[in-house]
Amino acid sequence: MVKPPAGGNDGGRAKPARLKTAFGRTPSQQAWLERQINDPFSAKARALGYRSRAAFKISEIDDKYRFFKKGAKVIDLGCAPGGWLQMATERGVTDIVGVDLLPVDPVAPAHILEMDFTDPACPPKMLELLGGAPDLVMSDMAPNTVGHRETDHLRIVGLIEIGADFAIEVLKPGGAFVAKAFQGGETAAVIAQLKKHFTKVVHFKPKASRSDSSEVFLVATGFKGR
């Protein structure tokens, strides 16, 4: 717990916590840590036992679209650290498979694969574990960044396209695809592709997304088939 500065606070309101700069920590890392400590959704996630604030993003999407329900089959691409898996299973989903390059602690009753989704062996394995075609494919995949904004953005868009292609290939009729994206940039092509196969494609920005972030989610519903 971070203690408030001596002398109390202004008008009874807690001041944002500040961290002493640690050896080897860059200014950007310092800013990220302070933002995490002071972020209400991060604090709420810790208090409720969710592995990340992203759990609240997917919960807001589900509040609107009601994807998570008993009997639904769900695939979670880029599932680490497991917040989306936690929210889905908490809301009644029992048939769910997640995949990530990083290790993910178990989330019962989900199946979790530590694999590269782009490995040709991965999609068949996921479908085998799921026991059939999914009702929902959700993607929070993120690439390794190189620090060059345009290059990093193109890599993100590339992963959205890979996730969308997979969803179009495997979804049940009437199914849905949800993917993290960013406003602007090169997403027009993937949105056009989704509109060919889904009855509705929208941008959705949850309240749990930071207001200063360009993060949005693509939500495609009513899969019409290949």
From Swiss-Prot:
**Would you name any one GO CC term?**
cytoplasm
List where this protein forms a coiled coil.
none
The EC number(s) given in the record are 2.1.1.166
> What does the record give as the reaction this protein catalyses?
uridine(2552) in 23S rRNA + S-adenosyl-L-methionine = 2'-O-methyluridine(2552) in 23S rRNA + S-adenosyl-L-homocysteine + H(+)
Q: Where does S-adenosyl-L-methionine bind?
A: G82, W84, D100, D116, D140
From which residue to which does the signal peptide run?
none
Task: Give the residues annotated as active site.
Answer: K180
**Top-level EC class as recorded in UniProt:** transferase
Give the UniProt keywords, A-Z: Cytoplasm, Methyltransferase, rRNA processing, S-adenosyl-L-methionine, Transferase
Which GO MF terms are attached to this record?
rRNA (uridine-2'-O-)-methyltransferase activity
Q: Where in the cell is it found?
A: Cytoplasm
Q: Which HAMAP family match?
A: RNA_methyltr_E
What role does it play?
Specifically methylates the uridine in position 2552 of 23S rRNA at the 2'-O position of the ribose in the fully assembled 50S ribosomal subunit.
Q: Which family does it belong to?
A: Belongs to the class I-like SAM-binding methyltransferase superfamily. RNA methyltransferase RlmE family.
Protein name (Swiss-Prot/TrEMBL): Ribosomal RNA large subunit methyltransferase E
Q: Which organism is it from?
A: Caulobacter sp. (strain K31)
What would be the name of the gene that encodes this protein?
rlmE
